[in-house]
Regions:
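Conserved catalytic-core segment of NTP-binding enzymes
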Residues: 1-5, 118, 130, 140, ...
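Short boundary/hinge segments that flank catalytic cores
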Residues: 1-99, 106-110, 116-122, 158, ...
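Residue-level preference for the first positions of well-ordered beta-strands
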Residues: 71-75, 100, 148-150, 182-184
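Structured cytosolic domains appended to multi-pass membrane proteins
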Residues: 104-108, 130, 148-155
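N-terminal glycine-rich dinucleotide-binding loop that anchors FAD/FMN and/or NAD(P) in oxidoreductases
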Residues: 119-137
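Short acidic/glycine-enriched loop/turn segments that link adjacent beta-strands
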Residues: 145-147, 193
């Protein structure tokens, strides 16, 4: 993220799908073909990856002077960079600190949050924004973490950007901000659609997710400039897919020590590369 002039909020290590994780998935009825790390902060709390998400939680809580951010948008410049997994585990780790948290699936083009939590998606955000103002049915409970509520996307609409820019969406965020300590929002990739830019003006700040050796710095710079022009704030970058040799996690009596190192590279680098121990 040095190339972008943004803070690095966390480095998330690459996760191997171990036999332990497969057993957990089978136990919970989750598909083994689904993202194996979506609920890692619950299902494998002692893993290096879960620890990295707790580091992200700490980074976010100290990212604003005065008070921690309340409404946080999580997005990426391109698809398949881990934004939904990052949004989910950010919400989980915040809720694990014993505060009320809600996560909203605002990816109305390719919603995924309901499937990770094992929830029905026949009703959700799009119903509310289209006139059904029943907030009780909108807020779903995830039984493994009572402090976390989930707002699924609902049926995919023909006009996602119009719904997300509506007065109803702004009113809903105000309502949820009065009810929850933190509101985490997942959106479509930033470059492909205007949805993330629209939502960025309605939240306290944005978390930009990137994938090591995949993400385009050029596209991320474009998004950063677009957000800057709108007057919105980017808290920093979460870099996914870091190889195990790049990040060290040591555990001492239940506590952890997190450190990372990054190599210098030149300004012509087209991708955000993996960081290596020096």
């Amino acid at each position: 993220s040095r190339h972008l002039g943004l803070p690095t909020l966390a480095l998330i290590p690459h996760y191997l799908n171990t036999d332990k994780r497969k057993l957990l998935s089978a136990k919970n009825g989750a598909s083994l073909t689904a993202a194996p790390t979506a609920l890692i902060a619950i299902e494998d709390r002692h893993s290096a990856m879960a620890e990295a998400y707790r580091h992200l939680r700490t980074s976010l809580l100290f990212s604003s002077a005065g008070k921690p951010p309340q409404t946080i948008l999580v997005t990426s410049s391109q698809p398949s960079e881990g934004k939904t997994t990052t949004a989910i585990n950010t919400a989980i780790t915040l809720a694990q600190s014993d505060v009320d948290v809600v996560i909203i699936d605002c990816d109305l083009r390719r919603p995924r949050i309901h499937s990770h939590f094992g929830l029905d998606n026949s009703r959700g955000l799009t119903n509310y924004l289209s006139g059904d103002k029943n907030t009780e049915s909108l807020l779903r409970t995830y039984q493994d973490l009572p402090k976390l509520k989930v707002v699924t996307s609902g049926p995919i609409p023909p006009n996602p950007a119009e719904l997300l820019s509506s007065n109803e969406m702004r009113s809903l965020l105000r309502f949820l901000s009065g009810k929850f300590k933190h509101v985490i929002i997942d959106s479509p990739p930033a470059i492909s659609f205007t949805d993330a830019a629209i939502l960025s003006t309605q939240v306290d700040g944005v978390v930009l997710v990137a994938m090591a050796n995949k993400s385009s710095i050029h596209l991320m710079r474009q998004f950063k400039q677009r957000i800057h022009n709108l007057g919105a704030r980017i808290y920093g970058v979460v870099l996914n897919g870091i190889k195990s040799s790049s990040v060290e996690y040591d555990y001492y009596g239940g506590s952890s020590y997190y450190k990372y190192y990054s190599n210098a590279d030149d300004e012509t680098t087209p991708m955000l590369g993996d960081t290596k121990v020096q």
